[in-house]
Amino acid sequence: CYYGRDLKEVGHRQQSQEIGYVLQNPENQIVTDKVWHELAFGLESLGYDTPTIRLRVAEMASYFGIHQWFYKNVSELSGGQKQLLNLAAIMAMHPKLLILDEPTSQLDPIAASDFLETVRKINRDIGTTIILTEHRLQDVIPWADRVYVMDKGSLLTQGAPREIGEFLKREHHGMFLSMPVPMQIYAEVENNLPCPCLL
């Protein structure tokens, strides 16, 4: 369901414009050889005019700090830079919804943390709705509105971060090893206090 409509009723062009998707492996998403062209590719595919493309590409290069490597070959970029480029190229189309499928799984811890902070910034500054699948729960739980926890391919629980913490504590579930430190401490202490979910 997308804004109250079955997704099958939403045209492909509207889906392409309004629903952004970032893959797990940055190599599988890049389609051009130059950074600037990757930023423009989606807009070109949707038929935007040249002035609009240039404006949006410049906005994204500035917003994401890409201007320093704007003219580089994509092959020269690190994994973190490639994933950031994928995100910027999607955001150039101004999607309402951004879906990210384990976008940090190929990144080192510092690049992953930086990438997730950028996603958080997009949600906070631009208001884009984010759906994120992620194993780094300690990094995303504190800023999530709603969490769905999967375990062995099945939905274990869902709710606000605080409710997730309380559930996992009640169930003595090992998933707490990947939760933020305040939640881990909460799980180890006998109390009836609300679960802390913010760092």
PLM-predicted stretches and their roles:
Residues 154-183:
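Conserved beta-strand-loop-alpha-helix hinge in the C-terminal portion
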Residues 134-135:
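H-loop/switch region of ABC-family ATPase nucleotide-binding domains
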Residues 1-14:
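ABC ATPase NBD Q-loop/coupling interface
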Residues 73-77:
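Conserved ABC ATPase signature
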Residues 51-69:
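Conserved ABC ATPase "signature" region
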Residues 94:
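Conserved catalytic motifs of ABC-family nucleotide-binding domains
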Residues 98-101:
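Catalytic Walker B motif of ABC-type/P-loop ATPase nucleotide-binding domains
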